[in-house]
């Protein structure tokens, strides 16, 4: 929820520091990381850092340097990335192998963002949202009794199957869908989403996440739900509109994480600096050209038969939905020959585990 100052930090009882070293990397302009002048006194070009492939390249080089300086080439190595970091680690898996000759034991993606789906949009991207709508509506007690009376994990497979088997084909028909089929699909979408059949038809079966965050509780409390974690509630200036005024969950997290990390670094680690710790970094414009990270991970796995992949997603994450992540895993290796090396874990949480 919304913690009240003063903040504190406490030991994590589930820490793995007794069996592994954890190395956190802040890419340029996040945390305390900044560009510095080169040997000629010139500031490096942003293009060397702010892009899908540039980001992967310099971070792979940093990881090689760190591993060499600390003599950890014989150690097992796992890389983990959250949100955009999911895209990053998919690309790093191949970059590390082919450019740094560093072979990984595992890649872990937490709430990964697959821009092959998110940016392209269309029937698949839209339909993959439905199971997230189901999870959120269940949490807020907005589903029909036949679903609401069951546990979340009992009903999600139903919604997933409907999204793949029925909703994608229906959306793919666009304006040529038969009127009776459109009506039947809208009725079932209402059943699984907690939204009214009327608003679903008004959106021609293609209901955006942002509208869902605004609409689900509109006629009840009038509150909005969070983007990154739909358990959080927000209060907009007006109940009308098609998207929330702000991200309720994000304001809560920044409200607590920012003082905590600054206190810990300065008081516990005794690191003194006036430099601002960036919770978010200025990295735009970001070059998204030639994003082949999904294919890069497949090739890395093909080249390295010991490389395994773990995906962790929260059912209440509306930014990078859990079913989008499941879909991504299924598309990495269409042959299915490596499917036993993929593991998906879902959690009753949001974007942040």
Label each PLM-derived region with a short phrase:
Residues 112-114, 315-316, 341-353:
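Histidine-bearing beta->alpha loop at or near hydrolase active sites
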Residues 26, 78, 106-108:
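Residue in the alpha/beta-hydrolase core beta-strand immediately N-terminal to the catalytic nucleophile
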Residues 173-320:
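Alpha/beta-hydrolase fold catalytic core
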Residues 71-84:
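Alpha/beta-hydrolase fold nucleophile elbow
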Residues 93, 97-191:
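A catalytic-pocket lid/entrance helix-loop region that shapes and gates access to the active site
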Residues 1-48, 330:
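N-terminal cap/lid subdomain of alpha/beta-hydrolase-fold enzymes
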Residues 318-341:
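Active-site-adjacent alpha-helix of alpha/beta-hydrolase-fold enzymes
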